[in-house]
Amino acid sequence: MNTSASGTEADLPVPPRESPAATLGRLLLVVLGVALVAAPVWVVATTGDTVRHQHWALAAVLGASVVAGLLVLAVALLGARRRDRGPSPRRPRARGVLRGVAVGIGIALLVVLAAAVVWLRPFPATAPALAALESDGSVEVRDEAGWIAFVPRDGAATTGLVYSPGARVDVRATAAVLRPLAEAGYLVVALKEPLGIAFTSPNQSASAMAAFDEVDTWAVGGHSLGGVVASSFAAAHDDEVTGLLLHASYPSGDMSTADVEVTSVWGSRDGLTTPDKIEASRADLPATTEFVEVPGGVHAFFADYGEQPGDGQPATSRADAQAQIVEASIGALDRLGVPSP
């Protein structure tokens, strides 16, 4: 009886042993799959409800990363089960090489996706900005698909500003700086940039301008990278745009002949848009540009999103700096025309 059982066991097929290289490859797939799922979870967990208030493209990328991660984990699991069922038929060498190249490219792209998700994590708005998002008797705040609009309630504003936030900065973080402009009678539209990067939609300002046809005098502007893109838009559309408001920013090229009124507001302690960069930008801006220094101000004082890596050390308070930024910004719009009555 025992002899018969032993003979039967000996006749059973033995699953092939996986090579160390194949085992390592499968483990790397598992790590990649986990990373693709974990990165979006980390972004959401560390930013609260920030993602749902940005342009939909950010949520789409996070969702794509989760789906890709689950698919990678499924491939790793199915591959292990197939190995247990026995060896696969050998493929022609050329076909195997092509498959290997395709797999390698796919894995590289997925690694880039996981890294991009981490890098695209927005700087969340802090309490002062969130408090400025409440509508009241003087300003209506409209949170729409492509932007947040600050609309004066007292009469129809005829002068407006389309504003592009800095790279990866929560659009809501601009509220405490932009709302006072609406309280002064100007329409202000803060753009929700795809992925939080203004360069991804350089003509987005045109859509906002078209949505508010009651406004006949427009300025565009922005903070940091947002200001760079706004500068390019103003230079290319100076027949439609009357003013340009730069917050810790400068143009990417020569726009000195553009027919726009420019105001450049900058902080003397800014570690990113440094005073030297502001000085160098003078040659690229119209001769009539008004430069307004915020003594002791830093890059992150132009919105409310906490500290920013690489920034300088402030020599003034955020409240004092923002009061000066608001005053200079209202002055820039005052130069263009009159606010609503």
Description of each model-found segment:
Residues 23-83:
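Membrane-embedded alpha-helical segments of integral membrane proteins
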Residues 89-121:
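Internal/C-terminal transmembrane anchor helices
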Residues 151-152, 157-167:
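Short beta-strand element of the alpha/beta-hydrolase
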Residues 164, 221-230:
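Gly/Ala-rich beta-loop-alpha elbow adjacent to hydrolase catalytic centers
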Residues 178-198:
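Conserved alpha/beta-hydrolase
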Residues 227-238, 244:
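Short glycine-enriched nucleophile-adjacent loop
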Residues 258, 262-270:
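Short beta-strand/loop motif that positions the catalytic acidic residue
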Residues 273-284:
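Short alpha-helix in the alpha/beta-hydrolase fold that links the catalytic acid
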